[in-house]
C-alpha cells in the first residue's frame, strides 16, 4: 500500500505550501483517479509517491518503505512506476528493445531475464514486432506505449499515469485506456491523473485536489455527477453526464448521476415513455 500522512511541501521556507496537509492511500490493486485544476498540486503529489521529490514534513511510504530513507529510494522507484505526460522524456535507447531493457539492466539482472522482460512488456502493450525499431519513427501513441512497456519491464506494483491520453487521437486514446484497464485487472495499483473525465469512469475512487489539498475522495458516480460543484473546481463532467445536466436545466426530469451514454439512452427512453416536467 502507498500511504501519505499529512504531507506538506514548499520550495522555499516562506513560500505558500504547494502541498498542504495531504493524506491519502492507494491499496494494492486499487484504481484511483486524481483530478483538479491546473496548479493544484497533482503532479507534485505523485512525484512524492516514488521519491522523485521529498516531503518538507509528513510521511510518504510505499509498502512500509519511507521515501525519506535514501537506502530505500531505488526499491521505491522500482515498485512505483511513473508514465509522464511527454513519453519522449522517458525513451533513452537507440531501439525500442534497448530502451525497455534500460531499467532492468540497472537492476543487475542476468541477460536472459532482461530479454524475457523486454519480450513480455512488448507483448503486454501490443508491440511485439517493434523491438528493433527506432523511437523517432513511432507515432505519439506508440511512444506512449513504449514508455509504459519500459515501466512494466521493472515489474512494478503500482503505476502512476500523468495525463496518459493527452494529445492522442481517438484510436490511440482508446488503446491506452484499454491497456490501463488491463493492467488494473492484472492486480496493479493505478493512479490516473487526467482532465478528461470520460477517461476515469471505471476507477474505484476519485480524489479531487484544490490549492494543495485533497477536498474530495469518493466513488466516481458520486464525484463526477456533481455538475455545479465540479464547475466551482474548474473541472468538467463526463460527456454523458453533461448532457443530462443540460436536459435538466431545460426542464426535463432525468437523473444526473449517470456517467456513460448507454445508460443515458436508457434514461431518456424511460423519460419519453413517462415524460414529467422537472421543477428543478
From Swiss-Prot:
Record domain ABC transporter: where: 2-236
GO CC annotation: ATP-binding cassette (ABC) transporter complex
Compartments reported by the entry: Cell inner membrane
Topological category with respect to the lipid bilayer: Peripheral membrane protein
EC number: 7.-.-.-
Keyword Translocase: yes
Superkingdom of the source species: Bacteria
Gene Ontology MF: a single term: ATPase-coupled transmembrane transporter activity
Listed InterPro entries: AAA+_ATPase, ABC_transporter-like_ATP-bd, ABC_transporter-like_CS, ABC_transpr_CbiO/EcfA_su, ECF_ABC_transporter_ATP-bd, EcfA_1, P-loop_NTPase
GO process terms (BP): cobalamin biosynthetic process; cobalt ion transport
Magnesium as UniProt keyword: no
Keywords of the record: ATP-binding, Cell inner membrane, Cell membrane, Cobalamin biosynthesis, Cobalt, Cobalt transport, Ion transport, Membrane, Nucleotide-binding, Translocase, Transport
Residues annotated to bind ATP: 36-43
Pathway the protein acts in: Cofactor biosynthesis; adenosylcobalamin biosynthesis
Predominant cellular place of this UniProt entry's protein: membrane
NCBIfam families per record: ECF_ATPase_1
Role according to the record: Part of the energy-coupling factor (ECF) transporter complex CbiMNOQ involved in cobalt import. Presumably responsible for energy coupling to the transport system.
The protein's assembly and partners: Forms an energy-coupling factor (ECF) transporter complex composed of an ATP-binding protein (A component, CbiO), a transmembrane protein (T component, CbiQ) and 2 possible substrate-capture proteins (S components, CbiM and CbiN) of unknown stoichimetry.
PANTHER family hit by this protein: ENERGY-COUPLING FACTOR TRANSPORTER ATP-BINDING PROTEIN ECFA1, HEAVY METAL TRANSPORTER
Similarity comment: family membership: Belongs to the ABC transporter superfamily. Cobalt importer (TC 3.A.1.18.1) family.
Identification of the protein by name: Cobalt import ATP-binding protein CbiO
Gene, per the UniProt record: cbiO
Amino acid at each position: 500500500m502507498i500511504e501519505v500522512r499529512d504531507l506538506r511541501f514548499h520550495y522555499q521556507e516562506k513560500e505558500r505550501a504547494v502541498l498542504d496537509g495531504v493524506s491519502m492511500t492507494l491499496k494494492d490493486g486499487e484504481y484511483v483517479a486524481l483530478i483538479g485544476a491546473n496548479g493544484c498540486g497533482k503532479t507534485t503529489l505523485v512525484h512524492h509517491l516514488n521519491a522523485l521529490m521529498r516531503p518538507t514534513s509528513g510521511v510518504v511510504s510505499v509498502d512500509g518503505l519511507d521515501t525519506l530513507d535514501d537506502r530505500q529510494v531505488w526499491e521505491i522507484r522500482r515498485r512505483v512506476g511513473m508514465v509522464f505526460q511527454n513519453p519522449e522524456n522517458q525513451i533513452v535507447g537507440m531501439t525500442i528493445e534497448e530502451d525497455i531493457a534500460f531499467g532492468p539492466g540497472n537492476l543487475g539482472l542476468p541477460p536472459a531475464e532482461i530479454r524475457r522482460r523486454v519480450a513480455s512488456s512488448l507483448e503486454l502493450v501490443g508491440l511485439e514486432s517493434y523491438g528493433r525499431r527506432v523511437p523517432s519513427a513511432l507515432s505519439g501513441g506508440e511512444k506512449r506505449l513504449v514508455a509504459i512497456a519500459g515501466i512494466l519491464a521493472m515489474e512494478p506494483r503500482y503505476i502512476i499515469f500523468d495525463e496518459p491520453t493527452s494529445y492522442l487521437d481517438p484510436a490511440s486514446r482508446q488503446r491506452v485506456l484499454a491497456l490501463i484497464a488491463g493492467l488494473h485487472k492484472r492486480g496493479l495499483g493505478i493512479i490516473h491523473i487526467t482532465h478528461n473525465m470520460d477517461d476515469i469512469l471505471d476507477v474505484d475512487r476519485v480524489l479531487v485536489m484544490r490549492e494543495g489539498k485533497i477536498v474530495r475522495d469518493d466513488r466516481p458516480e458520486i464525484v463526477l455527477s456533481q455538475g455545479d460543484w465540479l464547475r466551482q473546481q474548474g473541472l468538467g463532467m463526463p460527456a454523458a453526464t453533461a448532457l443530462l445536466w443540460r436536459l435538466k436545466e431545460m426542464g426535463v426530469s432525468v437523473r444526473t448521476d449517470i456517467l456513460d451514454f448507454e445508460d443515458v439512452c436508457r434514461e431518456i427512453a424511460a423519460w419519453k415513455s413517462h415524460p414529467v416536467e422537472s421543477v428543478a
